[in-house]
Amino acid sequence: MIGKEVTVQDIVLELSEVQPEVLPVDLFCEEELPNEDTEEELDTERIVFKVIAPCGCSHCEVKLRVFVQATEFGIRAFQQLLTGDLQLLCPECRGNCEHGGS
């Protein structure tokens, strides 16, 4: 280095002295990105799920089985509904409820 300020020309990197096992990597590898049509097909693929949920009444211990066909996004949204504001009712508890709040 000549002078008080470092310039790019003064910096010399020799990786072979620091770590001999470090080799340059070809960043243009043979990897291919999937085309957009394939991604859309995967997103719209519907799978059959069996959902087991408890009855929404506090005094009932019935387990309800529901079979649905949904995408991965759809089943996750359904799961969020069931663990949030939406509750399924068994036929007996449904008969004891008033419909529509009336």
From Swiss-Prot:
Q: Which organism is it from?
A: Human papillomavirus 36
Q: Where are the zinc fingers (unnamed)?
A: 55-93
Could you identify this protein by its name? Protein E7
Q: Which GO terms describe its biological process?
A: DNA-templated transcription; symbiont-mediated perturbation of host cell cycle G1/S transition checkpoint; symbiont-mediated suppression of host innate immune response; symbiont-mediated suppression of host type I interferon-mediated signaling pathway
Question: What Pfam family is a match, any one?
Answer: E7
Show the domain comment: The E7 terminal domain is an intrinsically disordered domain, whose flexibility and conformational transitions confer target adaptability to the oncoprotein. It allows adaptation to a variety of protein targets and exposes the PEST degradation sequence that regulates its turnover in the cell.
Q: Which domain of life is it from?
A: Viruses
Post-translationally, this protein is described as follows, namely: Highly phosphorylated.
